[in-house]
Amino acid sequence: DCCIIAGCPFGCTICC
């Protein structure tokens, strides 16, 4: 999902 691709361990609403 977008969080993994963006390298962010939080929810997509927070990171993306």
Curated annotation (Swiss-Prot):
Tissues in which the protein is found: Expressed by the venom duct.
Annotated localization: Secreted
Domain of life: Eukaryota
Molecular-function GO terms, alphabetical: toxin activity
Name assigned to this protein: Conotoxin ar3e
GO cellular component: extracellular region
Primary site of residence: secreted
Keywords: Disulfide bond, Secreted, Toxin
Disulphide-bridged cysteine pairs: C2-C16, C3-C12, C8-C15
Record remark: domains: The cysteine framework is III (CC-C-C-CC).
Native organism: Conus araneosus
Entry similarity comment: Belongs to the conotoxin M superfamily.
